[in-house]
Curated annotation (Swiss-Prot):
This is Ribosomal RNA small subunit methyltransferase G. It is found in: Cytoplasm. GO terms for cellular component: cytosol. The lineage of its organism: Bacteria, Bacillati, Bacillota, Bacilli, Bacillales. Its main location: cytoplasm. Keywords: Cytoplasm, Methyltransferase, rRNA processing, S-adenosyl-L-methionine, Transferase. Specifically methylates the N7 position of guanine in position 535 of 16S rRNA. GO terms for molecular function: rRNA (guanine-N7-)-methyltransferase activity. Belongs to the methyltransferase superfamily. RNA methyltransferase RsmG family. It is an enzyme of class 2 (transferase).
């Protein structure tokens, strides 16, 4: 996906990028590749691949959810900033918090935010399991997002405690989402979530399947969740 295709395919979906926003994506790409030589941020470094599999793929969430309001967003395990930083570039009014367990990635994100001149962004070095217990952030976000980090039953325990009642958990998944939903239904129920919508589409050019799940937070999450670091992964909430 070259820059012209990136721009026109977003335009088709009603997302028009200014020259400044296009410049921010260029700076993002250059900074990502430069830092990737020092630390492992991504296996994808070829420019057209980064634009398709990182930038465009992150923004697809906005094809199925309206980001036009100044929502507070928490991105869990964003690594090099996906999906929330590409969304923040497209929708500068969003208030973004990224939680990541690796300090080196947080250092990269702080540097990136300065280079991109982003405001209303915060980067927290923490495990999602401990972050989700903290006063002031628990059940405080309009939207919590995660992109293909873990299976749905595990991801729900890391993300739903952070979503305010009435808010939305957006899980961005690859193929095999149906199986994950089946195995994750019980966790959603326990944690106060309700699957409202699942959208399946092909990522352009490479035709790989993507699924975006919109999960509404209906009820407060019981206090015991999330459990201790590592437990959600070892003992997922599944029947």
């Amino acid at each position: 996906m070259n820059i012209e295709q990136f721009q026109s395919m977003l335009e088709e979906k009603g997302i028009t990028l200014s020259s400044r926003q296009l410049e921010q994506f260029e700076i993002y790409f250059e900074t990502l590749v430069e830092w990737n030589e020092k630390m492992n941020l991504t296996a994808i470094t070829e420019k057209e691949e980064v634009y398709l599999k990182h930038f465009f793929d992150s923004i697809t969430a906005a094809f199925y959810y309206d980001f036009s309001k100044p929502f507070s967003i928490c991105d869990v395990g964003a690594g090099a900033g996906f999906p929330s930083i590409p969304l923040k570039i497209c929708f500068p009014h969003l208030k973004v918090t990224i939680v990541d367990s690796l300090q080196k990635r947080i250092n990269f994100l702080n540097h990136l935010a300065q280079k991109l001149e982003l405001s209303d962004v915060a980067f927290c070095h923490d495990r999602a399991e401990t972050f989700g217990k903290k006063e002031g952030v628990r059940e405080a976000y309009d939207i919590v997002m995660a992109r293909a980090v873990a299976r749905l039953s595990v991801l729900s325990e890391l993300c739903l405690p952070l979503v305010k009642v009435g808010g939305t958990f957006i899980a961005m998944k690859g193929a095999a989402a149906n199986e994950e939903i089946e195995n994750g239904k019980y966790a959603l129920e326990v944690l106060g979530g309700d699957l409202k919508e699942m959208s399946t589409f092909q990522l352009p050019f490479e035709e790989s399947e993507r699924n975006i799940l919109l999960i509404e937070k209906k009820r407060k999450t019981p206090k015991k969740y999330p459990r201790k670091p590592g437990t959600p992964n070892k003992l997922p909430i599944e029947k």
